[in-house]
């Protein structure tokens, strides 16, 4: 659990395609969660079961009481939380790489059409088709990526699910443990012969870490909500600006938004019609 380098490298690759809020969220996730989990927190819980003692000699009673007191370790719960909140942003990164790869194919098709020698109007129509595909995917020239179209929807979905997972794990922790640990745990589970007292190791230190991780989770959740509203506001603003620009579409050339699978007809050197299919480039 102490080696998080692979996850950190993947999250670092997301930063160029994220907003300022997304970059801050990644820093908070790595510095205040992953780094702390791999060092101080894991060592603080290393003796969790070994130092859990009950004032009874009944065989099996201590193990049953420990299992009832800690259905899942705090450390393992936080590890699951880190994994779950990281998955949506990694899926967004996969979509970014897909768009970049497909954008290269579109650019290649565009170069081939420009180099072809046939009707100029047909070439212009085909180039507009490619431009429409690039716009829907959120891609631009030279394999650059702009957050728009389906890529923007993927990013907004990743933020939404991150916030859902953050809140879900906060509620799970509150339901199972609360946010403090007491030095004394009273157990009445079978096969204990009577009501027994069990004692936890370093409850104050662990309570401090629990509260710290709670604050970090709340901060991450707030960052997700702020970023979601920011991206939504920018998307609505751009949509309104686009609606205003459509007034001038009669005078200015506007890219055509066509379906993701369009069959084109080109003319080769012998003036024979050749069908060319633009494959779907977005998911």
From Swiss-Prot:
GO terms for biological process: cell communication. The lineage of its organism: Eukaryota, Metazoa, Chordata, Craniata, Vertebrata. Residues 1-23, 100-150, 232-283 are cytoplasmic. Residues 42-76, 174-208 are extracellular. The chain crosses the membrane at residues 24-41, 77-99, 151-173, 209-231. A connexon is composed of a hexamer of connexins. It is found in: Cell membrane; Cell junction, Gap junction. The gene is Gja6. GO terms for cellular component: connexin complex. It is a multi-pass membrane protein. Keywords: Cell junction, Cell membrane, Gap junction, Membrane, Transmembrane, Transmembrane helix. Belongs to the connexin family. Alpha-type (group II) subfamily. The keyword Iron does not apply. This is Gap junction alpha-6 protein. Pfam families: Connexin. Its main location: membrane. It comes from Mus musculus. One gap junction consists of a cluster of closely packed pairs of transmembrane channels, the connexons, through which materials of low MW diffuse from one cell to a neighboring cell.
